[in-house]
Amino acid sequence: MGSYRAEAQIAAPAHRVWNVLVDLDRWPVWTKSVRKMRRLGEGEFGLGSKVRITQPGLGTATWVVEEWQPNSSFTWTASLPGVRSVAQHRILPVAPGRVKVVLTIQQTGRFADLVERFYGKKIERYMRLEAEGLRRSLEGT
């Protein structure tokens, strides 16, 4: 089973961080870990939404939002043959106008160990890119 985590302290209130996280069209602007992100379907992004994400060197996967707590967290899952990925995005207040963003991915299934062996370092690096890119996009640094 692969387990990955990245976090960043961000000088911004939770609602601003949330607004950047749920603006799917902008992800390729603030993180190099995402080449393309496209919402499948109509309506607001939220519980049950499906998103197709293309990442350099990892290919394309469809993620489904399974948990949704506005201004706080969302969890989406993707399943490929032999591997199920569960990715959580949490925003934790640490002080007025300051939060800690915690990103986690858990991978399970018959081929999870192989994915970790061949792609684990890349997944870790991409998670750091996401956490730091989010911080930079909000702090302007």
Each predicted region: which residue ranges?
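Hydrophobic ligand-binding cavity/cleft-lining segments
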Residues: M1-E42
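Beta-strand/loop substructures that line and gate deep hydrophobic ligand-binding cavities in soluble
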Residues: T77-L129, L134-R136
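Glycine-rich portal/gate segments that line the openings of hydrophobic small-molecule binding cavities
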Residues: R38-V86, P96-R98, E132-T141
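Short, intrinsically disordered, mixed-charge
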Residues: N19-V29, G120, E132, R136-E139
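Alpha-helix boundary recognition
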Residues: V22, P28, E66-Q69, L92
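Hydrophobic-ligand-binding modules of eukaryotic lipid transfer/binding families
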Residues: M1-A8, R125-R128, E132, G140-T141
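Solvent-exposed residues in well-ordered beta-strands and their adjoining turns
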Residues: Q9-P13, T54-P56, L92, T104-T108
